[in-house]
Amino acid sequence: MTIPKELILNLLDSSNKNKQKSMLSQLTHNKDKGIIKNVISLFDDDDIKIRGEVFSILCLNENDISEILIDSLTSKSKNIRAFCSLILANRNDANGINHIIKLTNDSSSMARSCVLGALGYLRASNAMKEIHQGIFDSDVEVKKSAAHALSLLGEKLSDKEKIELEKQNDPDFEKILKKL
């Protein structure tokens, strides 16, 4: 039985979290652009369970929703930009790489961190310059994402980059430095 689009949109906009979760779980095969955009907008929901459900259904959706995800990378919402880059990576969707690269200088450190992680996961060798620059970001999580992305790409660090990571005095960097 097909659920009418209006009912889906009403339930997604509902303040009742149980109704939202119930509706979201039924949308893994949906390809309606309007519904997918509405689902993506829920990355700004206060409830982490809703955001997690959104992430899951978009990753599991086997339809070609690349264009919608790529368009969402220009959203005003840092959550939408960040999570859509990760979803493209989880879907192994290389179509979004050039669009994701543009977000390496995003105003949000959370978005930059996710973007660098996505580029590493996608093995985006054409983003090496941007990933290397991430080592010198002001945010420690962005540095970690950049370092991890470089390790996934089998890239070596310059002496200057090694010094920058060693300065962080963080066990995560020690592990990553051993890989690089």
List where the protein language model places each region.
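Short inter-helical turns and helix N-cap capping residues of alpha-solenoid HEAT/ARM repeat scaffolds
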Residues: 15-16, 46-47, 76-77, 107-108, ...
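Terminal, low-structured helical/coil segments at or just beyond the last alpha-helical repeat
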Residues: 161-180
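Structural detector for internal amphipathic alpha-helices that build alpha-solenoid repeat scaffolds
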Residues: 1, 10-11, 17-32, 41, ...
